[in-house]
Structures are given as C-alpha cells and as structure tokens.
Regions:
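Divalent metal-binding segments
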Residues: 1-112, 137-188
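A short helix-to-beta-strand connector/capping loop
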Residues: 101-103, 122, 127, 203
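C-terminal active-site-proximal or functional interface alpha/beta core segments in diverse enzymes
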Residues: 69, 201-203
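Carboxylate/His-rich catalytic cores and anion/metal-binding grooves
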Residues: 12, 113-126
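Non-cysteine beta-strand/loop elements that form the S-adenosyl-L-methionine
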Residues: 125-141
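Short intrinsically disordered, low-complexity coil segments enriched in acidic
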Residues: 1-4, 131, 203
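Distinct, well-ordered alpha-helical segments
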Residues: 89-95, 117-119, 189-201
Length: 203
C-alpha cells in the first residue's frame, strides 16, 4: 500500500487488495481495477493494513522518529494517534514510550468515542481519520458549497451529518477537552464552526 501525498488516498497492489476485507473492496471508494482507495475505503483499508505491522516495528518507528526530531531541534510533538491498530495499540505504545523519548508529547486521540478518550486519561481529542469531516483537494473530495470547477457534479464529501459532529463537540467540551477536527473545504469548515458554536452554547 502506497499512501498519496495528501494522506487521504492510497493505492494497493493485487497482493494487498487480496488481504483486504469485502467491506473495503465493496466500498464505492475502492477501485479494484486500479487498486485506488478513497474516502471510507481508504480509512478502513488503512485500519486493516495496520494489523500486518509487527509491534516491534511500531516501537522502532516511534523511537527512531523521535530521535530524528530531536536531532533537528524539535522538542514538543502534537501527535495524533488512533489509526486502526487492534485494541488501540498505537495509543498504548506512545503512552508507554513517551516518558523515555527526548520530546514532550501532546497526544490527540483520533476518535469520536469519548468513552475511549476518558478511559485512556487524555485531555485532547481529534485530528484526522475518525475526525475527518471531509477529504482534501488532491483527491477532489474536500466538501464545498459550490461544485469543483472541473466537475460541476462534484461538491466533495461530508463524512458526518451536522448532528453527529455537534454531539461530539458538545460531549468533548463538557469534559473540558481540547478538540481538533480535519476540515478542508468551506462546507466542512462551516460544519466544524457550527459544532464549536453548539458546544459553546451548551449549558
């Protein structure tokens, strides 16, 4: 699996496609002829692909990345975790390893499952993946109020109804947590701002 530069699509060879579930391959965002994965097919495909990464590779990747960042003077990392590893393995790994790494880490859990955030004791929630309100311009699925200039039938994709985003923002705000959401297109930005307004208005 090779990720697109924008982090919102990927292409798989036939061997990787064979490992993916029917849920991914039957998704409208999956093109089994070309191997391209977009939107929910991409997110679910990445979630399934992470199951094939050995735990020691995760540990080496985290520690090696932290050492490199330290070598170029970076001492604080805002890390977004929760990309589909079984039992949130990446979340547990960063929690265990962070005290021994050369940076301070501020962890954002990429989930709308507020119970899971509370269970891990985090005060920050959000990022991309489960918090992606839309896609991106590179894949032409950033959510817009007006159609794409090169495709008058394409307004992009909103991944959630407004009510669901409001519910998430209100719940997280009640806990006093810091919230981040991925919103690229103007329709998604408006959805995000509307959810923040709902959270602030909540009594």
């Amino acid at each position: 699996m090779v990720m697109k530069y924008d982090g919102h699509a990927a292409v798989c060879n036939s061997a990787m496609l064979a490992l993916l579930s029917d849920k991914v391959k039957s998704d409208p965002g999956c093109n089994t002829e070309t191997g391209w994965l977009y939107q929910s097919a991409f997110y679910n495909g990445v979630n399934e692909a992470t199951a094939y990464i050995p735990t020691m590779d995760i540990i080496r990747g985290l520690s090696g990345g932290a050492e490199y960042l330290a070598s170029v003077g970076i001492g604080l990392v805002h890390t977004v975790e929760g990309v589909g590893f079984a039992n949130d393995l990446d979340i547990d790994m960063i929690k265990i390893l962070a005290p021994g790494l050369p940076q301070a880490f501020r962890i954002f859990f990429q989930t709308m499952d507020l119970k899971a955030v509370k269970k891990h004791g985090f005060k920050r929630v959000g990022g991309c993946f489960k918090l992606a309100l839309d896609g991106c311009f590179g894949s032409e699925d950033a959510a817009l109020k007006e159609p794409y200039a090169n495709d008058p039938n394409n307004y992009g994709v909103l991944n959630y109804p407004q009510e669901r985003v409001n519910e998430f923002a209100i719940g997280a705000n009640r806990e006093g947590w810091q919230i981040t959401m991925h919103a690229i297109g103007d329709a998604a930005v408006e959805q995000c701002i509307t959810a923040y307004e709902a959270a602030y208005a909540d009594k």
